[in-house]
Amino acid sequence: MVTVLPGGTPQHSIAQPEPADVKPVALDLEGVRLDIPVFTTETRSLKASLIRSVTGGKLSRRGGGAVVTALQNVSCTIREGDRVALIGHNGAGKSTFLRLVSGIYQHTDGRFEAHVPVFPMIHKSFITSSELSGMQAIKAHYLLVHGNLRGFDAFCDDVVTFSGLGDFVQLPVKTYSQGMAARLLFAVLTAGTHDCLAMDEGFGAGDSSFFQKAQERMHGFLATAGTLLLASHSDPLLRQFCHRGLVFSEGSIVFDGPLEDALSYYHHTAD
């Protein structure tokens, strides 16, 4: 196996055989740091943007500019089939960690290897144009995730039926009400199964009349994920779907162990 460190040269290592009862590694992080450069610190709008988008970070000066260290010395190994709770107060680094393992952020230092594709359920909007019709948006998302249209018809039927959009799926997304757009997005992102799912509890269906139906679908969706990373403040939700906990504080993992031990550690230190 060849590992390329950021800004460095390939490092060669001989992979050791795993015991027969140990599942393959899905994600492997060692000493990972994530720095996010700040181009100016003079405007109030940037300050507000930092608060919204960077969690668990420390602002410092480096190389003539400002840098937010969002994650610091993060090390953990997640194996296929692990169901991991990300625990910590707002701003501890949970969402930033999800963005990093999903490929949205690139680490600055340390080693990070993803051996399975990670599907992020973090953003509340499509990475696409609102000029597209609902049908075109569904197809664009499917192509982005799968790289082809094999199995698309069944996927599309499921999305249209569950969202309840009917013929409105042929209209541009920009003509949808907020509730219609939220139902379409939720239906698309919870259709199918994924090898590894990274989910922030803050992701929601956005329509009160749709809530119960969405809750049932979400629980089924989480249950079918092969490997799960779930950031949440709900102990009952974490107990239902996870068996391991990572506790974050100030951009670092401060506890890694069985879920009940992790919850106990977090509540004890948070009091």
Roles of regions detected by a PLM:
Residues V2-T69, Y266-H268:
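Pre-NBD coupling/linker segments of ABC/ABC-like ATPases
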Residues D28, R33-P37, E80-A85, H89-V145:
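ABC ATPase nucleotide-binding domain signature region
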Residues G64-V67, P117, I122-L184, V188-C196, ...:
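ABC-family P-loop ATPase nucleotide-binding domains
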Residues V67, V74, D82-R83:
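Conserved N-terminal flank of the Walker A/P-loop in ABC nucleotide-binding domains
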Residues F211-T224:
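Helical segment within the ABC ATPase nucleotide-binding domain
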Residues S232-H233:
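H-loop/switch region of ABC-family ATPase nucleotide-binding domains
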Residues Q240-V247:
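Conserved catalytic segment of ABC-fold P-loop ATPases
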Residues S252-D271:
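Conserved beta-strand-loop-alpha-helix hinge in the C-terminal portion
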